[in-house]
């Protein structure tokens, strides 16, 4: 009546835990980075909004860039979740590969969000006093955003290695 669960040497029963952990780390850490970036830069935007309300729309760039970081984590989490199946053997190699994918994009987006938050907060406040700083601030924000993109690229490369393609 009951079906016996067989355990393979290369596909132990605990291997999917690492894949699920990678999926969770990708979402949790990248959303944490997006939240930090949004909160820190949002403080600067609210600070200048009381003095120069006309600058608020132009100052929303750091908030938008922080939100993109959560999308990076979402993409990797969906790809990891697509590789998990209860009916197929899931090797320990794939479990560790998916864990490293999640940690890679998660920590990259966390550090990127922190950088965007600091640059966005200080940049918006200084932009209020000197509008010529806008281009330089946007360039620094782009370089900060690219840190999260690098993590996603490495996670995608790792994910394709884990799937055997």
UniProtKB/Swiss-Prot annotation:
UniProt membrane topology term: Multi-pass membrane protein
Cell location: Vacuole membrane
Family the UniProt entry places it in: Belongs to the V-ATPase proteolipid subunit family.
Pfam families the record matches: ATP-synt_C
Subunit structure: V-ATPase is a heteromultimeric enzyme composed of a peripheral catalytic V1 complex (components A to H) attached to an integral membrane V0 proton pore complex (components: a, c, c', c'', d, e, f and VOA1). The decameric c-ring forms the proton-conducting pore, and is composed of eight proteolipid subunits c, one subunit c' and one subunit c''.
KW Ion transport (keyword) present: yes
Organism: Kluyveromyces lactis (strain ATCC 8585 / CBS 2359 / DSM 70799 / NBRC 1267 / NRRL Y-1140 / WM37)
Membrane-spanning segments: 17-37, 60-80, 99-119, 137-157
Source species, domain of life: Eukaryota
Entry-linked CDD domains: ATP-synt_Vo_c_ATP6C_rpt1, ATP-synt_Vo_c_ATP6C_rpt2
Described function: Proton-conducting pore forming subunit of the V0 complex of vacuolar(H+)-ATPase (V-ATPase), a multisubunit enzyme composed of a peripheral complex (V1) that hydrolyzes ATP and a membrane integral complex (V0) that translocates protons. V-ATPase is responsible for acidifying and maintaining the pH of intracellular compartments.
InterPro entries assigned to the protein according to its UniProt record, in alphabetical order: ATPase_proteolipid_c-like_dom (IPR002379), ATPase_proteolipid_csu (IPR000245), ATPase_proteolipid_su_C_euk (IPR011555), F/V-ATP_Csub_sf (IPR035921)
Record topology, Lumenal segments: 1-16, 81-98, 158-165
Any one GO CC term of the record: proton-transporting V-type ATPase, V0 domain
Name listed for the protein in its UniProt record: V-type proton ATPase subunit c'
Encoding gene (name): VMA11
Keyword Coiled coil found: no
Keyword field: Hydrogen ion transport, Ion transport, Membrane, Transmembrane, Transmembrane helix, Transport, Vacuole
Residue ranges that the UniProt entry lists as topological domain Cytoplasmic: 38-59, 120-136
């Amino acid at each position: 009546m009951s079906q016996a669960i067989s355990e393979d040497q290369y596909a132990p029963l605990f291997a999917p835990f690492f894949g699920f952990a990678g999926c969770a780390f990708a979402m949790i850490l990248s959303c944490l980075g997006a939240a930090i970036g949004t909160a820190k830069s949002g403080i600067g935007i609210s600070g200048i909004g009381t003095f120069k309300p006309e600058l608020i729309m132009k100052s929303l760039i750091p908030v938008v860039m922080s939100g993109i970081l959560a999308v990076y984590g979402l993409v990797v989490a969906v790809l990891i979740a697509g590789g998990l199946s209860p009916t197929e053997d899931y090797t320990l190699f794939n479990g560790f590969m998916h864990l490293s994918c999640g940690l890679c994009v998660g920590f990259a987006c966390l550090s990127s969000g922190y950088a965007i938050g600091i640059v966005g907060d200080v940049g918006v406040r200084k932009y209020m006093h000197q509008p010529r700083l806008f281009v330089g601030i946007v360039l620094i924000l782009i370089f900060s955003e690219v840190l999260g993109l690098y993590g996603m690229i490495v996670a995608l490369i790792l994910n394709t290695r884990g799937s055997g393609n």
